[in-house]
Amino acid sequence: MKKAKKRTRTRKGKARKKFKFASRVIVWRAGYNEGVDKGAWRFARVPEDISAKIKAMQKGRLRRGWGAVYAQAKVGKSEWVTSVFPDRHSATYILPLKKQIRYEENLYDGREFNFAIEIWF
């Protein structure tokens, strides 16, 4: 059985676009009882102007599941490979925040932090 290749830190030969923004950490409580959010997803909302640019760059390209767009994200000293997803409740994309990153960078719910993302096409 062959081992799966690890996704590299950069996607060679792909077009890239970098953005910086400030956003609050939001809790996605869908499917959880009110007041019980242990294990609930946390996201940073990409501002509308940047989301509009990402959407325009995606026009005419094949869509991935849920409309996801490959990205490399950075907050503080931490960087990780992820995807940003369109939020159907607003005209923005959302950036998922891994538990490990939240603990390493002390990202608390409702607080605002500075993020950087590099979108890959």
What is each residue range found by the language model?
Residues 2-91, 116:
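Long, compositionally biased stretches
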